[in-house]
Amino acid sequence: MNEELTFEEEMMRLEEIVNTLEKGNLMLEESFNLFKEGVEISKRLEKRLSEVEGKITLLINENEEIDFKEEEKDV
């Protein structure tokens, strides 16, 4: 896929893949290709989640530093 999908679009695609594989009516090669695509999507989703988690942690830490500095001013 050349175009970058949103997180939600990739989640929907992963759900489609899982549902299709669970039906069990595909040929072995088709199942393997879908499984491979699902693993690739899963890795991208995990990477995106990790990046967002890092940003959230950074924001929380920055906010704590600001709060701490404001408390020092009050003393």
From Swiss-Prot:
It catalyses: Exonucleolytic cleavage in either 5'- to 3'- or 3'- to 5'-direction to yield nucleoside 5'-phosphates. One of its GO terms (cellular component) is cytosol. One of its GO terms (biological process) is DNA catabolic process. It holds the Pfam family Exonuc_VII_S. Its main location: cytoplasm. Its EC number is 3.1.11.6. It is found in: Cytoplasm. SUPFAM superfamilies: XseB-like (SSF116842). It comes from the Bacteria. Heterooligomer composed of large and small subunits. Belongs to the XseB family. This is Exodeoxyribonuclease 7 small subunit. It comes from Thermoanaerobacter sp. (strain X514).
